[in-house]
Swiss-Prot record:
Positions with a binding annotation for ATP: K197, E318, G344, G345, D346, T347
Localization, UniProt: Cytoplasm
Record protein name field: Phosphoglycerate kinase
Pathway the protein takes part in: Carbohydrate degradation; glycolysis; pyruvate from D-glyceraldehyde 3-phosphate: step 2/5
Molecular function GO labels: ADP binding; ATP binding; phosphoglycerate kinase activity
Highest taxon listed in the record's lineage: Bacteria
Residues given in the record as substrate binding sites: D21, L22, N23, R36, H59, L60, G61, R62, R113, R146
InterPro entries from the UniProt entry: Phosphoglycerate_kinase (IPR001576), Phosphoglycerate_kinase_CS (IPR015911), Phosphoglycerate_kinase_N (IPR015824), Phosphoglycerate_kinase_sf (IPR036043)
Amino acid sequence: MSVKLMKDLDLKGKRVLIRQDLNVPIKDGNITSDVRIQASLPTIKLAVEAGAKVLLMSHLGRPTEGEYEEQFSLKPVAARLTELLGKDVAVVKDWEAGVELADGDVALLENVRFNKGEKKDDEALSKAYAALCDVFVMDAFGTAHRAQASTHGVAKFAPVACAGPLLAGELDALEKALANPARPMVALVGGAKVSTKLTVLDALSKVCDILVVGGGISNTFVASQGYEVGQSLYEKDLIPEAKRLREETEVVFATDCRVTTVPFDQWSDDSPTEIRKADEVKADEEIIDYGPESAERVAQILKEAKTILWNGPCGVFEYDAFAEGTKVTAQAIADSEAFSLAGGGDTLAAIDKYNLADKISYISTGGGAFLEYVEGKKLPAVAMLETRAAE
């Protein structure tokens, strides 16, 4: 990765503008999960300890661009940062004329999405951000796939543009899993639809030794063998793609399934289920998880892996009745000696549910950015940092 790194720069007395992902869930003015704020702390502390004048920026929610809306204000985030850093962090609403800070001070610009032109990567807005700093630090991997003024444009015009520790860590982990993986490399991809993950499956099939599919994706592969899948979620039109992938790489999917006849609007933690061989599913049944044989087989594959990339659950794990497959495979990843990289919202929820965060080598904070990187797409914000580093 040929980008400048914040840790290599002398920041003493410099105005340092850090783009972070502080887009946290807020209910009735209270932050319900501060995971992203906690993740941003090492970068902020590094800049403060280096004697920089630290200015932070982030988006929050989806306000109407160009309009101030109190519910999307970053004030609760600033209050939490003040607590965690033990120093006052003010929210700056009117920053165009510049922000006066002493060395070691920290302030937070108000929600970047209140600024007209943010999403369009507006040049004038990008230059206005750039004028606030001597060094711009991109540290928000979760927004690196968007070319916007606070992620991409500002990096173009800032005197110096570099990657923060969080972004650099993400890129290193992705490179370790995808560019030069220790083998065997196993990719576990779950989720509802083949269509939304087809490019991911394609890209991973070229890198991994074994491609394991779960969830609704597995159902489409089961159907590609000519088997009945009853009421299960699957994509008939993508059966040819499933067959093609099976020819191109070793694909592992359900050989036995957990099924239910309970309509989905009545699902609960104790919904009744049955176990069926993959070729014995009845017309009125719906596949909602791996059967025990499949889960055990996948767990064994994961146990022998040296690199694991995990994106998506094996079943409808939100309900305990349908969660066993996800639980067994998640535990196998946690117990594995492999370098394991996990990403995507549902995956993080599963890691949370089974309390496995400290057993996964690297957990990616970016949903869309994670998938686009896996697909082999260039992330605009990272590409801009590379361009600036080459100057």
